[in-house]
Amino acid sequence: MSDSSKPHNSSPNNVPRLLSHATSSQESHDERVTAVKDNIIESGDHLGISVEEQLALLDAFSHLELGQFLLKHHGLNAHWTHNVIAHRPTHYINSLEEIIYTQLPNVLATRERFGIFQRLLQELLRPDAVMISVPCGVMADLLLLDYTRHRDVKLIGIDLDKQALEEAYKLASQQGLENQISLVLTDAWTIDLAVQADVITSNGLNVYEQDDDKVTELYRVFYSGLKPGGTLITSFMTPPPTLSQDSPWINTDPKLLALQYVLFSRIIGATWTAFRTHQKTQSQLEQAGFTDIQFINDHMHMYPTVIANKPF
């Protein structure tokens, strides 16, 4: 890597904890599976899915690489986030893996959200634009755009996970964009973007942060990093009907939602549960200073995209 593109840490003495997939558990895989089994038995049937069926789901899930990672970490890292979005297996280990990649509502909403981001970001490409992704993960949101007419764009990826930045650099090299990319290892809440960005794109961080004030503060960081007239493209996860009467979810299959609940809540213990409504998200963005806020829903209204602008 060149000096301008290799990851560097702007806060080496104070590295905050990864929200998405950090784990301090010393449990072995077998110990974790046993603990989940006990929880399933104690919790009982769920919406037509018997304890025996849930235990069979756990067994099938524990044989998948994705399943083993989620059982340990309870959230997705950069590699597995990109895998869920982009991977199209030609062979499935078992029927559960096929359901996860082709039918699970949250996965389909995530893929649709990614496609919406790609369309919007492509439209925002301009000569000499500075585009920032935070947290960038493998940075597919920016690195998979078409830069045929915009080879002068500057791309900046910011993440707290060193492995994510390494994978982002690999993808940049594959795309022939290694000379346009800069990577920074730091916490999203502490970055100083020096009012340099034309576009900031952010996905997958607010869903792990339960504190509304901290999320609003994150939006303030983004606002301060944008040039006047700059644009933020972000997203959020809406609450399911089981948690809120204000849930906007539509076009969902009840059986698949029940399966998803068992996987996420009883088996994985998922940490991406910081759900917010459209109204709450709009309020947070307005508090941060953004105007002209627009929402684009996926067809299930699970994972909306938000476009927000910094006024001139």
Language model segments and positions:
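Conserved SAM/SAH-binding beta-strand->alpha-helix loop
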Residues: 161-163
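A short acidic, Gly/Pro-enriched loop at the edge of an enzyme's catalytic core
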Residues: 189-200
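A short SAM/SAH-binding and catalytic strip from SAM-dependent methyltransferases
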Residues: 198-213
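Class I SAM-dependent methyltransferase Rossmann-like catalytic core
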Residues: 61-126
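C-terminal alpha-helical "lid/dimerization" subdomain adjacent to the S-adenosyl-L-methionine
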Residues: 233-288, 293-295
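A short glycine-rich, Lys/Arg-flanked "PGG" loop and its adjoining helix->strand segment in the class I
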Residues: 215-228
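Conserved SAM-binding loop
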Residues: 168-169
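Conserved SAM-binding loop of SAM-dependent methyltransferases across substrates and taxa
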Residues: 137-152
